[in-house]
């Protein structure tokens, strides 16, 4: 360690703050917080016999140290979190911002509230229920609610503009407040019952429903009594599946972890109103810091990304700086008292042990899956002669409609799994007509330039196409100056002498093109390596087609609006401001349009838009997805680059 760094260590303050460890290139490799900065940072250099890789290499890795002083531990937690999100250091716990927590939102301030599926909690006065462990679990809950409690499911826009009841009203699952004057008192009674059901307050809810059922039977309202009976049966079946975990009926998040070497898996067990509500695992690698630091950092990041903050947070061990700062921060986020506890006995300790058992089981399962994936990736590296182990792969596809709406997609796979935080969409900027080779050159150039700026390059690029597309991608790599990334092309065979295209069962084998190799490589079509590549290629194709249709629709509606006589810039802005998007303008009825531009102009706009039919026919190519629950990501495009030799 150089003398300048030793001086910094000697001069470290004893106050609370955040420290940033940097490598010799100035890159932040770790961010931590401490009540006493000097004690915490110097402890990394005073631990004799410490076998952790990070500590043993700290003298070689550390190039600089930066500290930021704050007033208290709560401020240190906030600043630590912001700096981790900003720098994404390699040795910190990093949570993906992928909206993975599904919950239900109910805004009781509305005249006719509805349940909404959301992925983030806001302090907006609404009630939130969850999180749910899977989309299937939340669908089952909504199925029961929609069938037996009869709340509306339509959006506020539809509620305000619908002129006649929908099918749900006709089958008795919605009172249709969009059309009929439904008494708010009756509707809000159903809302109260939904809240009791979602909170797990079975006794109070069931007792009230039984009284209503008896009253309906006494008044000879047998259909209503039968409906309430079915409602009771469904509620009781649903509650039977939920295990009672505690007798104090609180909302709790229970944290635990399992660690082997530098790999760690955190597990969060959700308890709502004393009942187990599921849980989720969070695996991480290259984690060399003490357990106490990692659990504190993980909990802080977990709640920062919008997770519901319960009444109690249970931890598996004491934190180095205590729980006071974390408790104050969570209390501020929730707006009411939150207790952070490390249980020593009783039901709470049993919950921590249960979470730890789930963490160990999830760790073992993921280790087995990772070992299998690593074997497949190793074989792929060997068969294709790749320089890099293909831990992170990105696949690119070009899509257009008859030469217009030219777009490209980028999908990413990390350790064999879809990495949707790295999905990107591109609009081709430098071409006015179709040229797949030049389009591929542009997209690869833009991707690699951005990757060089952010020090974020994949191990392998997979190009959807044959020799031509591969040559364009390789030319872009050379022009940008990237030589460390492998690149291959993936295309179907067109050898008609070998494969009968008319035979129903015939399937052309996939061929893999490699730079500098004359003949393509043909892997076994049923191999795991081939399946991984084709699944990624099909996902890139699906993603590109979806984006291309969005672009095409927007351009057509925009063009149609511009061609309608009397619709100038002001009216176009009025329509977009009212409906929110070009798609909604195109979907609007004449009556809905008339509310914005008047009856006469509404008929003209409706006729003009529907005179430009959209290409909604199903694509003949079967589109496969890496994840059925995929949601489109926001468009992220980087700076353009002129096409080169393609």
From Swiss-Prot:
<dbReference type="Pfam" id="PF01541">
    <property type="entry name" value="GIY-YIG"/>
</dbReference>
<keyword id="KW-0228">DNA excision</keyword>
<keyword id="KW-0267">Excision nuclease</keyword>
<dbReference type="InterPro" id="IPR050066">
    <property type="entry name" value="UvrABC_protein_C"/>
</dbReference>
<protein>
    <recommendedName>
        <fullName>UvrABC system protein C</fullName>
    </recommendedName>
</protein>
<dbReference type="GO" id="GO:0006289">
    <property type="term" value="P:nucleotide-excision repair"/>
</dbReference>
<dbReference type="InterPro" id="IPR001162">
    <property type="entry name" value="UvrC_RNase_H_dom"/>
</dbReference>
<dbReference type="Pfam" id="PF08459">
    <property type="entry name" value="UvrC_RNaseH_dom"/>
</dbReference>
<feature type="region of interest" description="Disordered">
    <location>
        <begin position="604"/>
        <end position="646"/>
    </location>
</feature>
<dbReference type="GO" id="GO:0009380">
    <property type="term" value="C:excinuclease repair complex"/>
</dbReference>
<feature type="domain" description="UVR">
    <location>
        <begin position="203"/>
        <end position="238"/>
    </location>
</feature>
<comment type="function">
    <text>The UvrABC repair system catalyzes the recognition and processing of DNA lesions. UvrC both incises the 5' and 3' sides of the lesion. The N-terminal half is responsible for the 3' incision and the C-terminal half is responsible for the 5' incision.</text>
</comment>
<dbReference type="InterPro" id="IPR004791">
    <property type="entry name" value="UvrC"/>
</dbReference>
<dbReference type="GO" id="GO:0009432">
    <property type="term" value="P:SOS response"/>
</dbReference>
<dbReference type="GO" id="GO:0009381">
    <property type="term" value="F:excinuclease ABC activity"/>
</dbReference>
<dbReference type="InterPro" id="IPR000305">
    <property type="entry name" value="GIY-YIG_endonuc"/>
</dbReference>
<feature type="domain" description="GIY-YIG">
    <location>
        <begin position="14"/>
        <end position="93"/>
    </location>
</feature>
<dbReference type="GO" id="GO:0005737">
    <property type="term" value="C:cytoplasm"/>
</dbReference>
<dbReference type="Pfam" id="PF22920">
    <property type="entry name" value="UvrC_RNaseH"/>
</dbReference>
<dbReference type="Pfam" id="PF02151">
    <property type="entry name" value="UVR"/>
</dbReference>
<feature type="compositionally biased region" description="Basic and acidic residues">
    <location>
        <begin position="604"/>
        <end position="637"/>
    </location>
</feature>
<dbReference type="InterPro" id="IPR047296">
    <property type="entry name" value="GIY-YIG_UvrC_Cho"/>
</dbReference>
<dbReference type="InterPro" id="IPR041663">
    <property type="entry name" value="DisA/LigA_HHH"/>
</dbReference>
<comment type="similarity">
    <text>Belongs to the UvrC family.</text>
</comment>
<dbReference type="InterPro" id="IPR038476">
    <property type="entry name" value="UvrC_RNase_H_dom_sf"/>
</dbReference>
<keyword id="KW-0742">SOS response</keyword>
<keyword id="KW-0234">DNA repair</keyword>
<dbReference type="InterPro" id="IPR010994">
    <property type="entry name" value="RuvA_2-like"/>
</dbReference>
<dbReference type="InterPro" id="IPR036876">
    <property type="entry name" value="UVR_dom_sf"/>
</dbReference>
<dbReference type="InterPro" id="IPR001943">
    <property type="entry name" value="UVR_dom"/>
</dbReference>
<dbReference type="Pfam" id="PF12826">
    <property type="entry name" value="HHH_2"/>
</dbReference>
<keyword id="KW-0227">DNA damage</keyword>
<keyword id="KW-0963">Cytoplasm</keyword>
<dbReference type="InterPro" id="IPR035901">
    <property type="entry name" value="GIY-YIG_endonuc_sf"/>
</dbReference>
<dbReference type="GO" id="GO:0003677">
    <property type="term" value="F:DNA binding"/>
</dbReference>
<comment type="subunit">
    <text>Interacts with UvrB in an incision complex.</text>
</comment>
């Amino acid at each position: 360690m150089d003398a300048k760094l030793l001086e910094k260590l000697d001069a470290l303050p004893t106050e609370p703050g955040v420290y940033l460890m940097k490598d010799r290139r100035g890159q932040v490799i770790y961010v931590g917080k401490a009540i006493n900065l000097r004690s915490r940072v110097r402890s990394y250099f005073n631990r004799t016999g410490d076998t952790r890789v990070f500590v043993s290499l700290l003298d070689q890795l550390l190039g600089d140290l930066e500290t930021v002083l704050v007033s208290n531990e709560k401020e240190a937690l906030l600043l630590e979190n912001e700096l981790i999100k900003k720098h994404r250091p390699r040795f910190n716990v990093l949570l993906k911002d992928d909206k993975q927590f599904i919950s239900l939102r109910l805004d009781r301030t509305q005249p006719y509230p509805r349940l909404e599926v959301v992925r983030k909690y806001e302090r907006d006065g609404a009630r939130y229920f969850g999180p749910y462990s899977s989309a299937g679990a939340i669908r089952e809950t909504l199925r029961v609610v929609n069938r037996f409690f009869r709340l509306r499911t339509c959006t506020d826009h539809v509620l305000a503009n619908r002129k006649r009841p929908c099918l749900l009203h006709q089958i008795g699952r919605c009172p249709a407040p969009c059309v009929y004057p439904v008494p708010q008192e009756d509707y809000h009674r159903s809302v109260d019952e939904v809240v009791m059901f979602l909170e797990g307050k079975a006794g109070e809810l069931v007792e009230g429903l039984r009284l209503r059922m008896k009253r309906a039977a006494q008044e000879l309202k047998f259909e209503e009594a039968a409906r309430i009976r079915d409602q009771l049966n469904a509620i009781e079946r649903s509650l039977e599946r939920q295990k009672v975990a505690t007798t104090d009926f609180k909302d709790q998040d229970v944290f635990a972890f399992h660690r082997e070497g530098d790999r760690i898996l955190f597990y969060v067990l959700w308890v709502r109103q004393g009942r187990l509500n599921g849980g989720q695992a969070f695996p991480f690698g290259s984690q060399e810091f003490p357990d106490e630091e990692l659990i504190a950092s993980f909990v802080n990041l977990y709640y920062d990304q919008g997770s519901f903050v319960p009444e109690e947070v249970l931890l598996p061990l004491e934190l180095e700086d205590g729980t006071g700062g974390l408790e104050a921060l969570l209390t501020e986020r929730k707006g009411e008292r939150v207790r952070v506890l490390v249980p020593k006995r009783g039901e709470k300790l049993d919950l921590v042990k249960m979470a730890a058992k789930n963490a160990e089981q999830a760790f073992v399962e993921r280790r087995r899956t990772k070992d299998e994936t690593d074997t497949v990736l190793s074989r792929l590296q060997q068969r294709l002669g790749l320089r890099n182990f293909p831990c992170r792969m990105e696949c690119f596809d070009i899509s257009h409609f008859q030469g217009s709406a030219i777009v490209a997609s980028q999908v990413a796979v990390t350790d064999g799994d879809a990495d949707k935080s790295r999905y990107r969409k591109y609009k081709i900027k430098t071409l006015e007509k179709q040229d797949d080779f030049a389009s591929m050159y542009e997209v690869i150039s833009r991707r690699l330039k951005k990757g060089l700026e952010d020090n974020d390059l994949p191990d392998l690029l997979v190009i959807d196409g044959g020799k031509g597309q591969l040559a364009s991608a390789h030319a872009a790599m050379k022009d940008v100056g990237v030589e460390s990334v492998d690149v291959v092309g993936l295309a179907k065979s067109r050898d008609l002498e070998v494969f009968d295209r008319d035979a129903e069962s015939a399937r052309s084998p996939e061929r893999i093109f490699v730079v500098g190799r004359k003949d393509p490589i043909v892997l076994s079509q049923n191999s795991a390596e081939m399946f991984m590549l084709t699944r990624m290629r099909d996902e890139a194709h699906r993603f590109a087609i979806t984006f291309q249709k969005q672009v095409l629709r927007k351009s057509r509606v925009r063009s149609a609006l511009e061609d309608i006589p009397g619709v100038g810039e002001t009216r176009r802005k009025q329509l977009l401001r009212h409906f929110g998007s070009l798609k909604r303008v195109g979907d609007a009825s004449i009556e809905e349009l008339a509310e914005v531009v008047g009856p006469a102009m509404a008929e003209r706009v409706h006729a003009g838009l529907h005179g430009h039919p959209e290409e909604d026919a199903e694509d003949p190519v079967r589109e496969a997805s890496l994840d059925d629950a995929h949601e489109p990501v926001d468009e992220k495009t980087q700076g353009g680059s002129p096409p080169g030799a393609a």
